[in-house]
Amino acid sequence: GVATLNGADANHPLATYAFTTNPTAASAIGIAATDSDNSGVAGTAGAANIRSGRVRLSNAYGSELLDLPLDLRLQYWLSAAQGWQSNTLDTCTAIQASDFAFAFAGAGNNLSACETAMTIGGAAPNYTATLTRPGAGNAGWSDITLNLGAAAAGNRCTAVGAAGPAAATANAPWLQFNWTGA
């Protein structure tokens, strides 16, 4: 395809692309510049590989007496035969503990709001999200959501205590993935 960029549009710092198809292998996108009098560079001035990506946050369970690590991986789709792979070329996606929202169930759950707190270790593409141990008598569960969209939802627990302030967002919608397949 061909896209046209004129001088009035040249100040936009970021382009957003929506891939609505299933995960695909890397696609090379090239750029060829031609000015208004049609004198330009023959061929492409450069190309970049665009990949289908996602964040994978693993489930975990364990004792309320121990910290609970959850693997968090930045991945890209390589092929149908090789599936999702660690994206070692991603050195700039930043995930913070404040990007996670917590939801604590009521009935039958001994884990109250923010009796555990989230910390993040590691660096892209291999992070570890750790829930601090809530202590004896605080067995229970929490649903944890990593906010990747432009807007955040929920409350964070970055320190043990009462429910924390509103969660932030990593603002990386290109890493969202349809886990339910619907």
Question: Can you name each region flagged by the protein language model?
Answer:
Residues 1-182:
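Core sequence-specific DNA-binding domains of diverse transcription factors
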